[in-house]
Amino acid sequence: MSDSPLSDSPVDRDPAASELPRRDFLRMAGVGTGALLAGAALDPATLAAQATQGRPFRRRFGRASGHVVVVGAGAWGAFTALNLRREGVKVTLVDQYGPGNSRSTSGDETRGIRSSYGDRTVSAELWVAWARKSIERWRAFDAEHAKRFGTRFFYTTGDVIIREKPEPFTTRTAELWTAQGVRFESLTAAEATRRWPQFVSEGSQVVLYEPDAGVARARDSVQAAVALARDAGVEFKLGRIRPGAVAGGTMEALSFDDGTRLAADAYVFCCGPWFPKLFPSLMQTRMRIPIGHVCYFATPEGDARFQFPNIPSWNVPGVTGWPALPVDNHGFRVRGAFAPPAPLRAADEEPPPPPAPVPVDPRTQDPDLSPRWSAQERIDGSRRVLQKHFPALAEAPLNSTRACHYESSVNRNFIVDRIPGASNAWIAGVGQAEGFKFSIVMGEYVASRVIGELGDPLVAEAFKLPTAEYDPNQPNRWDD
């Protein structure tokens, strides 16, 4: 804890803190959508009592006060720190490698942002609504800050989903879009071919196009958010932090490797795949940290068909990708792979036995140690996607590969909740491979919870630390 109690350590209005008015994200997440997310009829009064344990931050001159340490300068941590500072809170942001570093979940060049969440088994309505709000915010962030930082942060590419026949994912996505008034087009394969002849879609019965979807600069956006936070008065510290002991209902001061202690009124851990290392007993069996791989292929010399704005981001079964972006033209991005064709066998030939299980390399479950290279068979699988859908790129040179851990919780929802037994310490994250997309609005939501604003109690309930756990004997070897 800090030397003085929370209510006695106000931070006065500071001209360095942004005077932007509070945004309306929480109002958008109303009780109706909260009920959908929670998936059950819950007593709001009970939830409110649970969610407001501990003292909220006292307000002075209409602004919050106190000191918060945010651990993790990834997408969620950066926007949480920025929004806390905009509320008037003193903020210290800590990261062991730096904002947007290559080990982080959002340290890649780009991320797609779309609202097609018909494949979600829970909370699909809310995810669509929040994704639409995120798209608006990314556009506004780009318009406001691109000139200063000398780079675009968001490109409205549109997103096209192609399937050979209707699937629950495509049917439900179209239903959700219709119900929420989302702009989209349902095209025939012939119409798609006329619009994007470089994208082979013959034989597809389902072509859904979301024109407002886009692609964001991931690493650049995280680093820009941290720069804006520092301009507003957030202090940044580089170093590895250890959680403080939990005693008497609160977490005590954090400590760096050199023994230096960092005390505050509240602590917010936005640590992505590092959660199982920081809180092993709490998070080891409540989340998984698979590794996702992507390839960036060179676009042909003198051929702009595979560059923005000439082709949208795209979604085929098991694989997503998008065009090369200006001005660096890092490459045409492919995430996922097609399996090689099965070998031919005689009609009476027995199928081969399944391959023997490969022991899990423990380094793959440690974001500090995990190798991020992509095996050749994975690259070959991504190239098979090009051969089928983008034949002009079938032999394109490989510019680079990227790999990062992402997080999946046992209940497939984000986690925004207090650490058990510590009224002043929070876990915020576990992004379900979608965390960057939502970070620009979730940073505001997390900040509001930390300063004591509950918002919709049903949403708060849905984002609680799950009580279910993964089977500890189940191998944690997911990757894609």
What is each of the regions a protein language model found here?
Residues 1-24, 45-51:
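N-terminal secretory signal peptides
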Residues 28, 162-232, 237-238, 244-250:
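Flavin (FAD/FMN) cofactor-binding and adjacent substrate-gating region
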Residues 67-92:
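N-terminal Rossmann-like FAD-binding beta1-loop-alpha1 element of flavoenzymes
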Residues 71, 262-272:
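Short hydrophobic core segments
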Residues 82-86, 150-155, 271-422:
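Active-site substrate-recognition segment that forms the wall
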Residues 86-105:
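Glycine-rich FAD pyrophosphate-binding loop
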Residues 110-195:
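Dinucleotide-binding Rossmann-like beta1-alpha1 core, especially the glycine-rich loop
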Residues 384-480:
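C-terminal catalytic lobe of FAD-dependent flavoproteins
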